From Swiss-Prot:
A zinc finger (C2H2-type) spans 345-370. It is found in: Nucleus. Changing R552H: No change in synaptic density. Forms homodimers and heterodimers with FOXP1 and FOXP4. Dimerization is required for DNA-binding. Interacts with CTBP1. Interacts with FOXP1. Interacts with TBR1. Interacts with ZMYM2. Residues 421-425 are annotated as: CTBP1-binding. Keywords: DNA-binding, Metal-binding, Nucleus, Repressor, Transcription, Transcription regulation, Zinc, Zinc-finger. This is Forkhead box protein P2. Residues 387-408 are annotated as: Leucine-zipper. Pfam families: Forkhead, FOXP-CC. Residues 1-28, 314-323 have a biased composition (Polar residues). The leucine-zipper is required for dimerization and transcriptional repression.
Length: 714
C-alpha cells in the first residue's frame, strides 16, 4: 500500500510539474499573445481568460496556506482528508464559473510549489498586470489623439474650401460689376457722345476761376504787407517808432508755414542767395499778372475783405489742361527767356532745381510739381520773408554807404587847443581835458548797444605843429614825471608784470638802478642784472638779444653806473649823487625848442606815411587813459612810439613806450602849481609840459635817456 501511494504521488507530482510547465508556457505565450493582440485590437481574447483563471487559482492557494498556518493540523492525513472538503467551497466562492472543484483539488493535492515560490510568482503576475494596464492606457491615449488630429484636419480642410469658395464668388462678383460698368459706359457713350466733354469743360472753368481768385487775393495781401512794411521802415528811420529787438519787425513772419517741415524751411533759406528784388511786381502765377489791379493800400484792403469765400474744387486729372487753357486765354504769353522761374534749362523754384529740356517741359513741370497747394503757398510765404529780410539788410547797407560817403566828403576837423595850458598836470587831468575838447575822443561805453548812427569823423592825417608837443608829453613816464619811487609802482603790480607780457613804464636806466638797489650788497654782475629783468618782468623773457644789448649800452653810457673790479669779477654799482643830479635836470618845455621842432631837417625824414596815419587816427592824447584803448590799437601805438624814440628824443628826457596795457599807476596826491604860458608863446599852444626846472644843455639830459626801442626790438 505504501509503495502504491508513493508511486501515485510521484506520478501526480510529475503530472503536476508537467501541468505547471504547460501553464507557465501558456502564461508566457498568453502574455506574448496578449501583447500582440493588444497592438492589433482591444477585445478580450482566450489568453486573457487564462490569465484570469491563473490569478483566481493563486488567490485560492494563498487562502489555503493561510488556513493551514492558522489551524496547525497535526497529521497530514487529517489535512488530506479535510482538503477535499474545503477547496471546492473556496474555489466555488472565488471562481465558480471558470475552475471546477476537481481541477482545484488536483492543483492543491500535488503540493509542488513552496510558499516562497508562490509569493515570487504572485509578484511577477502583479508586475505583468501593471504593464498590461499601462499599455492599455497608452493605447487608449494614442487612439484619442489620432482621433482629435483627424477631426482638426477635417475642420481645416472644410474652412479652406469655404474660403476658396468665397474668394471665387467675390472675384466673380467683381468681374460682373466691371462688365456691367463697361456696358453702362459704352451705352452712355453711344447715347450722349458730347456730354462728358461739356462736363470736363465746366469743371476746368470752375477750377480756373478758383485759382485766379486765390492768386489775386494772395497778391493783394502781399502788396498790402509790403506797403505796411515800407511805412514802418519810414517811421523807424524818422525815429517816430522803435521796434524792440525781441519782437518780430514784420507781421508776415507770424503767418503759419503749413506743409513744410523745419528742415525744408532751412533748406529754402539756404538756397535763396540769388533772389531778385520784388519791388516792381508781385508774384506771377500761371502767366497772369495781377499787380496792376490795386492802386492803393485802401483799395487792396477793401477788396480783400469784400472777396467772398472760395470753394476749393478737387483737381484730379484735368489740372494741366485747366492751367493750359487759362494760359492760352490770358493776354500775356510767356516765353522761356522772360520767365523768372526758368533759366539755363533749370527750374528756379526755391529748393527744386529740376532740369527741363525746353520751355514746354518746364511748364508741365511747373503745373504738376508746383501747383496751388499747401506746400507751394508755404514756400511762397518763406520767399516773402526772405525778400523782406534782404530789403531790411539792403536798407542798412545803404545807410552805411551813405554815412561812409558823407564822411569821405566832409572836411577833416582839427583838434582844438586847450584854452589855458598848464605847465604841470597829471595824466588823469590830461585825459579828462582831451575828452572834453577833442572831437576824436572815443565813446565811454563802446560795448553798450546803440542805434545805428553816422560814424564819428576821424582826426587829421597830417601832424600839425600844435600836436607835436603832445607826443613828447605822452612819452614821459609818470614815475619820472612826479619823482615817484619805482618800488612803489612795481610792488602793488608785481604779479601783473611777472605774468603779463607788458612793457614796464620805466627807462632801462631806472630798471638797472632798481635791480642794483634791491640786491643785498648794492652791487650786481651783468648776468645777475639780466636774471633780475627776466625774473621780474615777463616782457623781457623774449627778444633777449635786443634788450640785453640795450642794458649794456645804458651801463656804459650813464655816469651814475660805476663798474668795480673785485675778486669775483666785475660788478656794477649805482652812484646815487650822480643819478639824482642827472634826474633833476629836465626839460621844461622851452618855447624856442617847440618852435624849432617843425622846421628841423630830420623831422620829416623820421616820420613816414604809416606813422603819420597811425598818429592821426589813434588819438594820441588819449593814451594816458588805459581804459579807452583796446589791445590791437595799443600794440600799434607801442610800435609807433618805438619808432619815435630815435627821432624825438630831444623833446623830452625820459620815457619811451606806451603804457596802454600797463595797469593804472598808483598816483599819490601832489600839489600842482598852475602857471600861465608866456604871452609870446601863445601862437604855439602846448597841452602838456613837464617838470619845473629847465636845462639849457640838451646833450647832458640825453645821457640818461635809454636805448631807442626801434633798435632794441629789431
Amino acid at each position: 500500500m505504501m509503495q502504491e501511494s508513493a508511486t501515485e504521488t510521484i506520478s501526480n507530482s510529475s503530472m503536476n510539474q508537467n501541468g505547471m510547465s504547460t501553464l507557465s508556457s501558456q502564461l508566457d505565450a498568453g502574455s506574448r499573445d496578449g501583447r500582440s493582440s493588444g497592438d492589433t485590437s482591444s477585445e478580450v481574447s482566450t489568453v486573457e481568460l487564462l490569465h484570469l483563471q491563473q490569478q483566481q487559482a493563486l488567490q485560492a492557494a494563498r487562502q489555503l496556506l493561510l488556513q493551514q498556518q492558522t489551524s496547525g493540523l497535526k497529521s497530514p492525513k487529517s489535512s488530506e482528508k479535510q482538503r477535499p472538503l474545503q477547496v471546492p467551497v473556496s474555489v466555488a466562492m472565488m471562481t465558480p464559473q471558470v475552475i471546477t472543484p476537481q481541477q482545484m483539488q488536483q492543483i492543491l493535492q500535488q503540493q509542488v510549489l513552496s510558499p516562497q515560490q508562490l509569493q515570487a510568482l504572485l509578484q511577477q503576475q502583479q508586475a505583468v498586470m501593471l504593464q498590461q494596464q499601462q499599455l492599455q492606457e497608452f493605447y487608449k491615449k494614442q487612439q484619442e489623439q489620432l482621433h482629435l488630429q483627424l477631426l482638426q484636419q477635417q475642420q481645416q480642410q472644410q474652412q479652406q474650401q469655404q474660403q476658396q469658395q468665397q474668394q471665387q464668388q467675390q472675384q466673380q462678383q467683381q468681374q460682373q460689376q466691371q462688365q456691367q460698368q463697361q456696358q453702362q459706359q459704352q451705352q452712355q457713350q453711344q447715347q450722349h457722345p458730347g456730354k462728358q466733354a461739356k462736363e470736363q469743360q465746366q469743371q476746368q472753368q470752375q477750377q480756373q476761376l478758383a485759382a485766379q481768385q486765390l492768386v489775386f487775393q494772395q497778391q493783394l495781401l502781399q502788396m498790402q504787407q509790403l506797403q505796411q512794411q515800407q511805412h514802418l521802415l519810414s517811421l523807424q528811420r524818422q525815429g517816430l517808432i522803435s521796434i524792440p529787438p525781441g519782437q518780430a519787425a514784420l507781421p508776415v513772419q507770424s503767418l503759419p508755414q503749413a506743409g513744410l517741415s523745419p528742415a525744408e524751411i532751412q533748406q529754402l533759406w539756404k538756397e535763396v542767395t540769388g533772389v531778385h528784388s520784388m519791388e516792381d511786381n508781385g508774384i506771377k502765377h500761371g502767366g497772369l499778372d495781377l499787380t496792376t489791379n490795386n492802386s492803393s493800400s485802401t483799395t487792396s484792403s477793401t477788396t480783400s475783405k469784400a472777396s467772398p469765400p472760395i470753394t476749393h474744387h478737387s483737381i484730379v486729372n484735368g489740372q494741366s489742361s485747366v492751367l493750359n487753357a487759362r494760359r492760352d486765354s490770358s493776354s500775356h504769353e510767356e516765353t522761356g527767356a522772360s520767365h523768372t522761374l526758368y533759366g539755363h534749362g533749370v527750374c528756379k523754384w526755391p529748393g527744386c532745381e529740376s532740369i527741363c529740356e525746353d520751355f514746354g517741359q518746364f511748364l508741365k513741370h511747373l503745373n504738376n510739381e508746383h501747383a496751388l497747394d499747401d506746400r507751394s503757398t508755404a514756400q511762397c510765404r518763406v520767399q516773402m520773408q526772405v525778400v523782406q529780410q534782404l530789403e531790411i539788410q539792403l536798407s542798412k547797407e545803404r545807410e552805411r554807404l551813405q554815412a561812409m560817403m558823407t564822411h569821405l566828403h566832409m572836411r577833416p576837423s582839427e583838434p582844438k587847443p586847450s584854452p589855458k595850458p598848464l605847465n604841470l598836470v597829471s595824466s588823469v587831468t590830461m585825459s579828462k581835458n582831451m575828452l572834453e575838447t577833442s572831437p576824436q575822443s572815443l565813446p565811454q561805453t563802446p560795448t553798450t548797444p546803440t542805434a545805428p548812427v553816422t560814424p564819428i569823423t576821424q582826426g587829421p592825417s597830417v601832424i600839425t605843429p600844435a600836436s607835436v608837443p603832445n607826443v613828447g608829453a605822452i612819452r614821459r613816464r609818470h614815475s619820472d614825471k612826479y619823482n615817484i619811487p619805482m618800488s612803489s609802482e612795481i610792488a602793488p603790480n608785481y604779479e601783473f608784470y611777472k605774468n603779463a607780457d607788458v612793457r614796464p613804464p620805466f627807462t632801462y636806466a631806472t630798471l638797472i638802478r632798481q635791480a642794483i638797489m634791491e640786491s643785498s650788497d648794492r652791487q650786481l654782475t651783468l648776468n645777475e642784472i639780466y636774471s633780475w629783468f627776466t625774473r621780474t618782468f615777463a616782457y623781457f623773457r623774449r627778444n633777449a638779444a635786443t634788450w640785453k644789448n640795450a642794458v649794456r649800452h645804458n651801463l656804459s653810457l650813464h655816469k651814475c653806473f660805476v663798474r668795480v673790479e673785485n675778486v669775483k669779477g666785475a660788478v656794477w654799482t649805482v652812484d646815487e649823487v650822480e643819478y639824482q643830479k642827472r634826474r633833476s635836470q629836465k626839460i621844461t618845455g622851452s618855447p624856442t625848442l617847440v618852435k624849432n621842432i617843425p622846421t628841423s631837417l630830420g623831422y620829416g625824414a623820421a616820420l613816414n606815411a604809416s606813422l603819420q596815419a597811425a598818429l592821426a587816427e589813434s588819438s594820441l592824447p588819449l593814451l594816458s587813459n588805459p581804459g579807452l584803448i583796446n589791445n590791437a590799437s595799443s600794440g600799434l601805438l607801442q610800435a609807433v612810439h618805438e619808432d619815435l624814440n630815435g627821432s624825438l628824443d630831444h623833446i623830452d628826457s625820459n620815457g619811451n613806450s606806451s603804457p596802454g596795457c600797463s595797469p593804472q599807476p598808483h598816483i599819490h596826491s601832489i600839489h600842482v602849481k598852475e602857471e600861465p604860458v608866456i604871452a609870446e608863446d601863445e601862437d604855439c599852444p602846448m597841452s602838456l609840459v613837464t617838470t619845473a626846472n629847465h636845462s639849457p644843455e640838451l646833450e647832458d639830459d640825453r645821457e640818461i635817456e635809454e636805448e631807442p626801442l626801434s633798435e632794441d626790438l629789431e
